[in-house]
């Protein structure tokens, strides 16, 4: 199975900040990298697919980049509603494995 290593595991930032979450695959995944978020109520939503393509309805404050084994998710102009746990997932090979998650909190 392809192992996905996601960093950091937790992140605290202020409203308006820009934050970046990284994900590294144990082998080349040919840009088949998706990003999801899980809200505190358990709701899961796809944000980005195929490295950088925004899912319908996702604001342009979210962006993805990367290639080969190294990928990142950037959230600009952080908003209160962005409080979530974010996960990367590779879709290049079965099983479609996930990173361990990044819990994003807002500094008060």
Curated annotation (Swiss-Prot):
CDD domains, per the entry: IgV_L_kappa (cd04980)
Region (Framework-4) residue spans: 98-108
Any GO BP: adaptive immune response
GO CC field: immunoglobulin complex
Residue span of region Complementarity-determining-1: 24-34
Framework-2, as annotated region: 35-49
Domain of life: Eukaryota
Pfam family membership, one: V-set
UniProt-annotated stretches for the region Framework-1: 1-23
Region (Framework-3): 57-88
UniProt keyword annotations, A-Z: Adaptive immunity, Disulfide bond, Immunity, Immunoglobulin
Listed PROSITE patterns: IG_LIKE (PS50835)
Region (Complementarity-determining-3): 89-97
Record has Disulfide bond as a keyword: yes
Protein name: Ig kappa chain V-V region HP 91A3
Source organism phylogeny: Eukaryota, Metazoa, Chordata, Craniata, Vertebrata
């Amino acid at each position: 199975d392809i192992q996905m290593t996601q960093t950091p595991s937790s992140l605290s930032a202020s409203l308006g900040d820009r934050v970046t979450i990284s994900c590294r695959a144990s082998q080349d995944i040919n840009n088949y990298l998706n990003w999801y978020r899980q809200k505190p109520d358990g709701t899961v939503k796809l944000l980005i697919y195929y490295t950088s393509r925004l899912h319908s309805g996702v604001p342009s404050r979210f962006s993805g980049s990367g290639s080969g084994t190294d990928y990142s998710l950037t959230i600009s102009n952080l908003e209160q509603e962005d409080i979530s746990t974010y996960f990367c997932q590779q879709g290049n090979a079965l099983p479609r494995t996930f990173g361990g998650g990044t819990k994003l909190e807002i500094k008060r």
